[in-house]
Amino acid sequence: MSALFLMKTLGLFIATAIAEIVGCYLPYLWLKEGHSVWLLIPAAVSLALFAYLLTLHPAESGRVYAAYGGIYVLTAIVWLRIVDKSPLSNFDLIGTAFVLTGMGILVYGWR
């Protein structure tokens, strides 16, 4: 597996995770924070983009979903820190490291 392939796959995973998180965060803003119901339109677009991006990944769907989970966790932790402005705990960091280690094992098996 080339470094370029890994970088492209990682970028695709990150874009997919952002599309999913935004697609779920916008309805949260409407339901929990009292923002406009119109947020459901970009949420639906974001979730449709998420589903489309999943089809672009370079392995069988089950393997993609499993490996994608690691990037999703990492992206969610970054979101927690940047968007929610919540400090990260050692448990957040250690748990994320374990998840990413598992993801690395899965991706290594794609060879």
Curated annotation (Swiss-Prot):
It comes from Idiomarina loihiensis (strain ATCC BAA-735 / DSM 15497 / L2-TR). This is UPF0060 membrane protein IL1642. It is found in: Cell inner membrane. Keywords: Cell inner membrane, Cell membrane, Membrane, Transmembrane, Transmembrane helix. The chain crosses the membrane at residues 10-30, 36-56, 64-84, 90-110. The keyword Cell cycle does not apply. Disulfide bonds: none annotated. It is a multi-pass membrane protein. One of its GO terms (cellular component) is plasma membrane. The keyword Transmembrane applies. InterPro entries: UPF0060. It comes from the Bacteria. Belongs to the UPF0060 family.
